[in-house]
């Protein structure tokens, strides 16, 4: 759905696609690979106010449970119900979005090149 070069990335391994003042948020291939098979996901509710850097949900895999941190501040305007009912979608397609938020200010995040360097092992 999204090309990696069109996205920006957080240090907590969320990706963001910016469309005017709307941010589409997902988790990166790198995070999905580290997590393994994803079996459960908890996301913020629609209309929730979110703050950049704060925990907004949880993702559970066969290996671990991790928190989801919001890469943006604003109001959640949509939640991807498909990924809640079928969290394994993230294992087959990391471009699956988690939630959309209307943002007041878009923060400085890493571009694809910076994120690639950040995740180099």
From Swiss-Prot:
GO terms for biological process: glycine decarboxylation via glycine cleavage system. The modification N6-lipoyllysine is found at residue 63. Keywords: Lipoyl. GO terms for cellular component: cytoplasm; glycine cleavage complex. Binds 1 lipoyl cofactor covalently. Residues 22-102 form the Lipoyl-binding domain. PROSITE patterns: BIOTINYL_LIPOYL (PS50968), LIPOYL (PS00189). Its cofactor is (R)-lipoate. It comes from the Bacteria. The glycine cleavage system catalyzes the degradation of glycine. The H protein shuttles the methylamine group of glycine from the P protein to the T protein. The glycine cleavage system is composed of four proteins: P, T, L and H. Belongs to the GcvH family. This is Glycine cleavage system H protein. It comes from Tropheryma whipplei (strain Twist). The lineage of its organism: Bacteria, Bacillati, Actinomycetota, Actinomycetes, Micrococcales.
